[in-house]
């Protein structure tokens, strides 16, 4: 699996990440974990060719690992780690578990995300009946992850463009060439990730 996106993510400036678009997508992914984490969203073949059910939690964890990514917010990382630890516990329901969590900060985040019942997606059938998020997890969760990753790349490309416009860098041919090379590398990583997922 490509580790390029992880490198892109780690290179970004730390300040003000909460205001960036990818942080909003990160929050949407965590919202899906809180609401539907234990739900089975698809089946995948294991190494022996057997179909195994994959929960929302497991899908997100595996998808992040593929690109060497982690969530920026420490509480989001903790939610995902604890969710993965307990996903196979008998009777585990992510929303109930996190809302009743002993850590008040974590419980507060979970309560806020669970109580915001804005539908993450708006899928309509031919009868114009609105299909709920839970019925479309196999489409919704991969889309949330793609949007999250796309936003990471977009933020990095924007950061490079600002650096290229800096007069100090403009006057330094070597620095300029290095930035252009980095821009191409990030764009290529982004393109390869898209090709891998569309095949």
Task: Indicate residue ranges for each PLM-predicted region.
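Non-catalytic protein-protein interaction segments used by genome-maintenance enzymes to assemble
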Residues: 3, 7-92, 110, 115, ...
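Single conserved hydrophobic/aromatic residue that forms the stacking wall/gate
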Residues: 1-9, 190, 197-199
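Bacterial replisome coupling helices
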Residues: 65, 74, 78-192
